[in-house]
């Protein structure tokens, strides 16, 4: 790679330019066939795992395709290639974690004095990094409600370099209109970055709406088995891809070959897993919606969700994440969580197993109480990542949890809620 950092050209911000998604194969086929039957040395059907940290030169000043695994690795490149094709981008960079992917984008696209616009209700880990770097003077930071056109217009009037979009948002599942926000971002001369972790390219492809960069925590649905951490960044244009690749190598945050191999294996079942994930989620919303102990249910697949129409237009499915606000105070929340059999209390999401998290004390604990309140993340909010267990078992587990919460949340004389 060149020792000179490639510049970000204005052409990178042209929403009309892009790399179309694979037209000759369905995305599910692209995911299954990633790297299949491409081993010319031995004819291995699945791609071999290349663990070597370095690669020999053919002779003096005769570098082969690869020289050092931090800079490039055949196994990791197969994953990057597959993700780029699934997203409709020109190329991808695989990183060690999802947070490394976010860090990569910030390093590659921003410099001191630039302004970054981020959603007020996004992932707590992203929020922590944005604020930590802004406090060190890495860039100026604006936190706004991207679903509010007036708030967005005000932020864009301050001429940001990058607008960060997260849709659906984590954990409240708010929907941002990709077409409208990306068009407005480009009109302001800024680069549009979309975190697509909650849906994966199986259900949403932001580049088709003009996004310049798409970010993933591949730990989640792309791998789907809660046994690997990783991240990825996909670029719409070659100039951005080159810049991201340069910075990934420079920072040393590229993904490990074994992790890439495992993620490739998980990717092959992405479409099949998501079908069951979503079927189970739909059944669970039927149980939760209107239940006396449920103060609010956040799921874009519900017709009365504020973002339902937009989600139906820009997504090919509503996903398997939902959040629910439990009535009855901390006692009710504790009772709901205590005794769960099929939902494990844990951070992360997107695995085959069902998980439940309490954002205020877990995924979004880094946010100040005021920031959580502004985002609508209350102490009674629970986030569910619905797995692929038998739906009857999941429904029974949640039904019992709701009953416990209802009993615990009942007012008892002399005992505060």
Describe each model-derived feature in a short phrase:
Residues 54-56, 235-240, 267, 326-331:
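Short loop segments at secondary-structure junctions
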Residues 64, 90, 229, 263, ...:
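Short amphipathic alpha-helical segments
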Residues 2-73, 79-82:
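N-terminal "arm"/small-domain region of PLP-dependent enzymes with the aminotransferase-like
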Residues 4-6, 18-21, 93-291, 413-416:
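Conserved PLP-enzyme active-site core in the AAT-like
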Residues 296-382, 386, 399, 417:
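Conserved C-terminal alpha-helix-loop-beta "cap" of PLP-dependent enzymes
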Residues 1-14, 131-132, 140, 154, ...:
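PLP-dependent enzyme catalytic core of the Aspartate aminotransferase-like
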Residues 54-103, 125-132:
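Conserved N-terminal alpha-helix of the aminotransferase class I/II PLP-enzyme fold
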